[in-house]
From Swiss-Prot:
GO terms for biological process: fatty acid biosynthetic process. GO terms for molecular function: 3-oxoacyl-[acyl-carrier-protein] reductase (NADPH) activity; NAD binding. Gene3D superfamilies: NAD(P)-binding Rossmann-like Domain. Keywords: Fatty acid biosynthesis, Fatty acid metabolism, Lipid biosynthesis, Lipid metabolism, NADP, Oxidoreductase. Catalyzes the NADPH-dependent reduction of beta-ketoacyl-ACP substrates to beta-hydroxyacyl-ACP products, the first reductive step in the elongation cycle of fatty acid biosynthesis. It comes from Staphylococcus aureus (strain Mu50 / ATCC 700699). Its EC number is 1.1.1.100. PANTHER family: 3-OXOACYL-(ACYL-CARRIER-PROTEIN) REDUCTASE, 3-OXOACYL-[ACYL-CARRIER-PROTEIN] REDUCTASE FABG. Belongs to the short-chain dehydrogenases/reductases (SDR) family. This is 3-oxoacyl-[acyl-carrier-protein] reductase FabG. NADP(+) binds at residues 11-14, 62-63, 89, 154-158, 187. Substrate binds at residue 141. It is an enzyme of class 1 (oxidoreductase). Disulfide bonds: none annotated. The gene is fabG.
Length: 246
């Protein structure tokens, strides 16, 4: 009988994280839904996951806090018996021009988006080493490859995630653990919905496929990297951006 595998998705109460959690559930994973703010939204995702016939629970943790992350990993293993897939999706923005950016704006984004990924990988690794298997998928961004004005802090973290992914992949490969990154381009969200038609048209001119991506495009890519079909892929960054960056 095939054993059910388990996954932890950080920042999974909404947006891309929610879509990833639901897709992994569709693939048969038990899924822990991490959140930082809204317990209500996280619990709603849990109910959607359970409706697919797998187990799920919501767990609050600030990924920038190593102790909270350690406790979260321990709880996931306690409830599910294993941790087979870690998806580092949690992230924030504090946009500002470089000359005007406050130190706190820089630190907040670095702590969540880069240190948070490090914390989760470091605390999840002992369990995966014991299992001699695991898949870690980190969310980067197209801007980590091309840069973006007004987002020096965010861009630095997303470029850093790519480097961290490569280093972790080299360290963990001998133990059967893969580490990859997914770098979304412009994805339909509340942010893109609020943009003017003129600005949307301007953004679309940068995308050869001439459309914005859907969060399911990202979720499907993550699910593939988490699967046995991707066992010979590690240290890679998969760009899902409609050709915006090649």
């Amino acid at each position: 009988m095939k054993m059910t595998k388990s996954a932890l998705v950080t920042g999974a109460s909404r947006g891309i994280g929610r879509s990833i959690a639901l897709q992994l559930a569709e693939e048969g994973y038990n899924v822990a839904v991490n959140y930082a703010g809204s317990k209500e939204k996280a619990e709603a995702v849990v109910e959607e996951i359970k409706a697919k016939g797998v187990d799920s629970f919501a767990i609050q943790a600030n990924v920038a806090d190593a102790d909270e992350v350690k406790a979260m990993i321990k709880e996931v293993v306690s409830q599910f018996g294993s941790l087979d897939v870690l998806v580092n999706n949690a992230g924030i923005t504090r946009d500002n021009l470089l000359m005007r950016m406050k130190e706190q704006e820089w630190d907040d984004v670095i702590d969540t988006n880069l240190k948070g990924v490090f914390n989760c990988i470091q605390k999840a690794t002992p369990q995966m080493l014991r299992q001699r298997s695991g898949a870690i998928i980190n969310l980067s961004s197209v801007v980590g490859a091309v840069g973006n004005p007004g987002q020096a802090n965010y861009v630095a973290t997303k470029a850093g995630v790519i480097g961290l992914t490569k280093s972790a992949a080299r360290e963990l490969a001998s133990r059967g653990i893969t580490v990859n990154a997914v770098a979304p381009g412009f994805i339909v969200s509340d942010m893109t919905d609020a943009l003017s038609d003129e600005l949307k048209e301007q953004m679309l001119t940068q995308i050869p496929l001439a459309r914005f991506g859907q969060d399911t495009d990202i979720a499907n890519t993550v699910a593939f990297l988490a699967s046995d079909k991707a066992k010979y892929i590690t240290g890679q960054t998969i760009h899902v951006n409609g050709g915006m960056y090649m």
